[in-house]
Amino acid sequence: KSYDEIIGMTKDKEKMLSSIPAIMPISNEDLTRTASGFGYRIHPIYKIKKLHEGMDFTASLGTKIYATGDGVVKTVKSSYRGYGKRVVIDHGFGYQTRYAHLSEFNVREGQKVKRGDVIGFIGNSGLSVAPHLHYEVEKNGEKVNPVHYYFNDLTPKQYEKMIFISSNSGQSFD
């Protein structure tokens, strides 16, 4: 292969690596702020067992929410139901992330974002019982467990702790 082809492949790989959602969406140094992990849970309002397709992070109203990978803001939407105020980012390479129950937005549709940019703030909008962030990762159209994507933020010991905390079978906040 030519030198130019190798440079092009390297740039594509760098773009892909910066696009993968690889950090936590809120600052969470003590790892005590997850409320509910991915999987079946008792819905806090409907009181039925339901698949929780993301991870809930409890935090104070107004806490900053960060883009977990580079991408383009696909959706900025407000609703009194469901996800409430939410942002969806298309990261390319088959990845999308959803950030729900926000109090405020810090982005607009079509805006390019970088990993670590503030995209919004913790809220209690939509079908929610307390201030928190509901965070989802989608790969090739399928919801996947977000806990497997925090590798840029956590040491192996912290990662083990996060797995343990997120596997609790408590109620979700949405």
Question: What spans do the regions from the language model cover?
Answer:
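Catalytic cores of peptidoglycan-degrading enzymes
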Residues: I26-S172
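Non-catalytic extracellular/periplasmic "stalk"
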Residues: K1-R33, G37
